[in-house]
Amino acid sequence: MALRAKAEVCVAAPWLSLQRARALGTRAARAPRTVLPFEAMPQHPGNRWLRLLQIWREQGYEHLHLEMHQTFQELGPIFRYNLGGPRMVCVMLPEDVEKLQQVDSLHPCRMILEPWVAYRQHRGHKCGVFLLNGPEWRFNRLRLNPDVLSPKAVQRFLPMVDAVARDFSQALKKKVLQNARGSLTLDVQPSIFHYTIEASNLALFGERLGLVGHSPSSASLNFLHALEVMFKSTVQLMFMPRSLSRWISPKVWKEHFEAWDCIFQYGDNCIQKIYQELAFNRPQHYTGIVAELLLKAELSLEAIKANSMELTAGSVDTTAFPLLMTLFELARNPDVQQILRQESLAAAASISEHPQKATTELPLLRAALKETLRLYPVGLFLERVVSSDLVLQNYHIPAGTLVQVFLYSLGRNAALFPRPERYNPQRWLDIRGSGRNFHHVPFGFGMRQCLGRRLAEAEMLLLLHHVLKHFLVETLTQEDIKMVYSFILRPGTSPLLTFRAIN
């Protein structure tokens, strides 16, 4: 991946095995007590123009996570990174995440994701909270939280997700039992994607799409393809100034806009259905998140559309890939899988009667999801544009600096997680109440944590609960799966898994 062996630390990244990358630690010496100036901070080696040329030539930045992990080893837990924009600092320790939260203002600021914003400006669409900053962000966020993120909201949409998870398990069981051996080996990734679309669509818009156990519609397949193109083109464009990329990558911009057109059309159709139904009669029971937002009318219709679009686009890949990697890790760690199965079976009757109890009666399964996201953080980094000066690792960080927290390296720090290469959900139960609040931050922190976090957690928890009750999950593959960065961190290949029915 590197252009020069000395200038770019990513020279070995494409061939660096995940097993080796997991075991890398931080060899940084203890920082001196005197606060050092920003300019004294170690800097990521290499020429930024060569790096941009490399991204353009390779049509992406697939090994970003390995490159940055290697750089942390060589430079320590903090360094500067120059991509031509504002001052940028990379960190990977929980203590720095905590300091970032402590200095959060009323309007915690993120960098503008230019390709996404450019599309919305060009098409005349509003931005949702993922893309907003300042007072408008806070106004929207405070009115979205009660119906999307609050415990009360979770209690309302969780039974809807549970119904889809049950259907997924039953559809899979039907396929397995059609085989005389009582087992089925398949690439389950497409089915998981259909599940996440179905569950999210039901929770958001109150409508079943018939994707689970049935052949997907052309509209759903087009939506999935559009998401893939959108994420890939985002990486190809996000590291370059628009003034440059519009000239050297016009085809990518065209693909990016066409993908968003498809995504917006999909989401807009869903919202229009709800809007028309509400115009005729007020529902007597809960019919989903978007209906509640429309009924309350605390946000404009355009703002509800904008935020619904972000939730729709952000609720598929980001949930499906952690689910796939959890199933893979449980398949190659059968002892862990059996313990989780026992927990699910013990709680089955209670959860069947009250699906909401899944959030409290499956602590080890919740820990398994934390362990998956430690090893495979679907969002590679968190970011803040700090509003005031602060000190990180004894270096002065001026206001206006972009600070990025790299979760891939945080999760593989042996000083924080002994034997970090080992898949061990129990470690999360062992550290509960130990004050390590910032060891698990895959959904962000503070007021800017992921708005769809609780929906994603419910979808993952319930699917795994129902699958573990009915199937042994096996794999012949013991080797690590190569992960690639494509705006989200995803497996480069999908593992074949065997589902064996439990009598």
Curated annotation (Swiss-Prot):
Membrane topology listed for this record: Peripheral membrane protein
Ligand binding (21-hydroxyprogesterone): 381
Induction: Expression is induced by angiotensin II, potassium (K+), and also by cAMP.
Catalysed reactions, semicolon-separated: a steroid + 2 reduced [adrenodoxin] + O2 + 2 H(+) = an 11beta-hydroxysteroid + 2 oxidized [adrenodoxin] + H2O; 21-hydroxyprogesterone + 2 reduced [adrenodoxin] + O2 + 2 H(+) = corticosterone + 2 oxidized [adrenodoxin] + H2O; corticosterone + 2 reduced [adrenodoxin] + O2 + 2 H(+) = 18-hydroxycorticosterone + 2 oxidized [adrenodoxin] + H2O; 18-hydroxycorticosterone + 2 reduced [adrenodoxin] + O2 + 2 H(+) = aldosterone + 2 oxidized [adrenodoxin] + 2 H2O
Tissue-specific expression: Expressed sporadically in the zona glomerulosa (zG) of the adrenal cortex (conventional zonation), as well as in aldosterone-producing cell clusters (APCCs) composed of morphological zG cells in contact with the capsule (variegated zonation).
Stretch forming the transit peptide: 1-24
Keyword Metal-binding recorded: yes
Example of a GO MF term: steroid hydroxylase activity
Binding-site positions, heme: 450
Cofactor(s), by name: heme
Effect seen on changing residue 112 to P: Increases 11-beta- and 18-hydroxylase activities toward 11-deoxycorticosterone; increases 11-beta-hydroxylase activity toward 11-deoxycortisol
InterPro entries on file: CYP11_CYP27_families, Cyt_P450, Cyt_P450_CS, Cyt_P450_mitochondrial, Cyt_P450_sf
Keywords: Disease variant, Heme, Iron, Lipid metabolism, Membrane, Metal-binding, Mitochondrion, Mitochondrion inner membrane, Monooxygenase, Oxidoreductase, Steroid metabolism, Steroidogenesis, Transit peptide
E.C. number(s) listed in UniProt: 1.14.15.5, 1.14.15.4
GO process annotations (BP): aldosterone biosynthetic process; C21-steroid hormone biosynthetic process; cellular response to hormone stimulus; cellular response to peptide hormone stimulus; cellular response to potassium ion; cholesterol metabolic process; cortisol biosynthetic process; cortisol metabolic process
PANTHER family cross-referenced by the UniProt entry: CYTOCHROME P450, CYTOCHROME P450 11B2, MITOCHONDRIAL
Further remarks about this protein from its record: Expressed in aldosterone-secreting tumors and in adrenal glands of patients with idiopathic hyperaldosteronism.
Cited function: A cytochrome P450 monooxygenase that catalyzes the biosynthesis of aldosterone, the main mineralocorticoid in the human body responsible for salt and water homeostasis, thus involved in blood pressure regulation, arterial hypertension, and the development of heart failure.
Family of the protein in this entry: Belongs to the cytochrome P450 family.
UniProt-recorded name of the protein: Cytochrome P450 11B2, mitochondrial
Organism: Homo sapiens
Lineage: Eukaryota, Metazoa, Chordata, Craniata, Vertebrata
Gene this protein is translated from: CYP11B2
